[in-house]
């Protein structure tokens, strides 16, 4: 790329930085005063004219200054050479705050609240997806001789409890047999494989009384737990940040709020995150969702040891501090994975 192109990109970079900071359209005089671009105001005006002609900036009707377009933001993001990481103190604070979570739900609630505070945007965290979860432990507890509590714990820390009404009583020996069979069928398996193994048990133990009845009834309860789509759950934090930035969304704020409430659009974007440590930035129309066209979404996956549990990120206006937001999303995702992996 030639010197003129490099210089024009520096002008674009300065326009993005100033517009994000001030919310005001940027003129050539302001660029000369605030940035050491090493060229005259006339040269900057010429560069801005080229950037506008190429679609990187535009002129609002009510101002003589310029603002970045979606294309301009994309060029800015694509050419971010280094994203400054959070400070050591900030990283320690994040880690400590998440480690204080008492269970999966608490850790994720803390994460979404923290991410919203760090970025001043709406934070979204997807609950761990069933398709990638593994059964860590199954507990079968007798509440009475004919009533069992089934507790399934996944490696991500998700806990699901169900009651199995047996109809007939079983003794302690049969309870021990049942617990061992179910644990062997499910333990260490992905939930899809665990579901198949439990279904196989139902086929092998057909009967109306004793152990066969207990296996059938408890297995059916477990199948209900395993096949429920709890991945279609989304935690939100910082929704009030949208209203504080309402001017950035024009008349689309209501549709954005509706999309967040319905969750489907955001979950689809998060489900596309399949690689922990890789941050994706979607700007405006790149979301491919009409309800949130006026937003940008910065997202990544979180998980442990090569296993992706779900997606997370932030949603906000295209006028966003992209470097800071990328760093915050990456850091919180990293520490969620570390905290969940240590449990």
Curated annotation (Swiss-Prot):
Keywords linked to the UniProt accession: Repressor, Stress response, Transcription, Transcription regulation
One record GO biological process: negative regulation of DNA-templated transcription
UniProt keyword Transcription regulation present: yes
Cysteines engaged in disulfide bonds, as pairs: none
Family annotation (InterPro entries): GAF-like_dom_sf, HrcA, HrcA_C, WH-like_DNA-bd_sf, WH_DNA-bd_sf, WHTH_transcript_rep_HrcA_IDD
Pfam families in the record: HrcA
GO MF annotation list: DNA binding
Function: Negative regulator of class I heat shock genes (grpE-dnaK-dnaJ and groELS operons). Prevents heat-shock induction of these operons.
NCBIfam families referenced in this protein's UniProt entry, alphabetically: hrcA
Name of the molecule in the record: Heat-inducible transcription repressor HrcA
Species annotation: Mycobacterium leprae (strain TN)
């Amino acid at each position: 790329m030639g010197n003129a192109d490099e210089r024009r990109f520096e002008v674009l970079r300065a326009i993005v930085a100033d517009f994000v900071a001030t919310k005001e359209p940027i003129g050539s005089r302001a660029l000369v005063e605030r940035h050491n671009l090493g060229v005259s105001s006339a040269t900057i005006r010429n560069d801005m004219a080229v950037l506008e002609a190429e679609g990187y900036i535009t002129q609002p009707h009510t101002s003589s200054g310029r603002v970045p377009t979606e294309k301009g933001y994309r060029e800015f993001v694509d050419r971010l050479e280094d994203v400054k990481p959070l400070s050591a103190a900030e990283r320690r604070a994040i880690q400590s705050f998440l480690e204080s979570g008492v269970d999966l739900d608490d850790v994720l609630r803390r994460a979404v609240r923290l991410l919203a505070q760090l970025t001043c945007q709406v934070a979204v965290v997807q609950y761990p997806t069933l398709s990638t979860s593994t059964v860590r432990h199954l507990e079968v507890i007798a509440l009475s001789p004919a009533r069992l509590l089934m507790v399934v714990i996944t490696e991500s820390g998700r806990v699901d409890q169900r009651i199995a009404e047996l109809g007939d009583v079983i003794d302690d020996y049969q309870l021990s047999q049942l617990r061992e069979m179910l644990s062997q069928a499910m333990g260490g398996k992905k939930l899809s494989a665990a579901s198949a193994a439990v279904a196989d048990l139902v086929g092998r133990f057909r009967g109306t009384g004793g152990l066969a009845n207990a296996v059938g009834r408890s297995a059916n309860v477990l199948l209900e737990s395993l096949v429920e789509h709890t991945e279609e759950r989304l935690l939100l934090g910082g929704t009030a940040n949208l209203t504080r930035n309402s001017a950035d969304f024009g008349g689309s704020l209501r549709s954005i709020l509706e999309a967040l409430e319905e969750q489907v659009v955001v979950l689809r974007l998060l489900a596309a995150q399949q690689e922990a440590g890789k941050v994706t930035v979607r700007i405006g129309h790149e979301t491919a969702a009409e309800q949130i066209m006026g937003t940008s979404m910065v997202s990544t996956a979180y998980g442990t040891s090569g296993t992706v549990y779900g997606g997370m990120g932030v949603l906000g206006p295209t006028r966003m501090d992209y470097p800071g937001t990328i760093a915050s999303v990456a850091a919180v995702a990293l520490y969620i994975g570390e905290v969940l992996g240590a449990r």
